[in-house]
């Protein structure tokens, strides 16, 4: 499989303070990579570099000419009083090369319907975005990330605002999407993502790539990504310990 994006010896940061140092990562077609690491370890910085939102200090980035990225950020803000319908929020995710300001064609409207059915909100097509819960809005923003048919989907803590009743369905949907595209999934919940991703990248100043989804305490400790147990109800989850430094 060909690489969609290849990062070589990337160093990046802010105001000349290095957050990532000598990072190497190759994302192939149909990869499903879980990105883990402590707060301040550089996960967000890595995403910014991949999304061209931050120029690295050094290193090179090679992108396949066919690369199309769909991005679901951790926090999506929208004025719930703004008079926009669900279908129009989704259509706003079209790439500028498709002239998103033009009236959408029949095939694009059909795609909206297919995506809404895919996430279980088929009856909300013409609803105002303000009528939706936070979790439902997150699902709509996922559709927005998918409307342009990306071959790389980037998700930053996608279950943050998703309804708990839909969380399991979300991960099943991502498994289906992985048949069509590569996925980068950022999460603090090691136990959850290790059961679904194919490989793991631990980001903590550098990037340590683990070519498997089998994550043990020993692996995380060797990569300087310590974990701790937290309780969600009666179920313990393995998550990364909090680091206060950037």
Task: Name each model-derived stretch.
Residues 51:
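Helix-to-loop junction immediately C-terminal to a conserved catalytic motif
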Residues 128-132, 136:
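Conserved ABC ATPase signature
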Residues 198-214:
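H-loop (His-switch) and adjacent beta-strand-loop-beta switch element
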């Amino acid at each position: 499989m060909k690489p969609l994006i290849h990062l070589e010896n990337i160093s990046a940061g802010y105001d000349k303070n290095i957050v990532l140092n000598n990072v190497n990562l190759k994302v192939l077609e149909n990869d499903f990579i879980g990105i883990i690491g402590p707060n301040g370890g550089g996960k967000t910085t890595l995403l910014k570099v991949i999304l061209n939102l931050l120029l690295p200090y050094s290193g090179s980035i090679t992108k396949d000419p066919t690369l199309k990225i769909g991005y679901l950020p951790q926090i999506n803000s929208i004025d719930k009083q703004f008079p926009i319908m669900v279908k129009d929020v989704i259509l706003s995710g079209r790439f500028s090369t498709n002239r998103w300001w033009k009236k959408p064609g029949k095939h694009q409207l059909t795609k909206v319907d297919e995506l809404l059915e895919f996430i279980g909100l088929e009856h909300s097509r013409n609803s105002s975005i303000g009528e939706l819960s936070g979790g439902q809005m997150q699902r709509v923003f996922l559709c927005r990330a998918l409307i342009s048919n990306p071959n790389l989907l980037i998700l930053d803590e996608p279950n943050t605002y998703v309804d708990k009743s839909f969380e399991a369905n979300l991960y099943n949907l991502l498994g289906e999407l992985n048949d069509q595209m590569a996925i980068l999934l950022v999460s603090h919940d090691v136990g959850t993502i290790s059961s679904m991703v194919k490989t793991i990248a631990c980001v903590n100043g550098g990037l340590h790539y683990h070519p498997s989804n089998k994550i043990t305490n020993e692996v995380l400790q060797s990569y300087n990504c310590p974990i701790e147990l937290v309780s969600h109800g009666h179920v313990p989850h393995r998550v990364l310990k909090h680091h206060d430094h950037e």
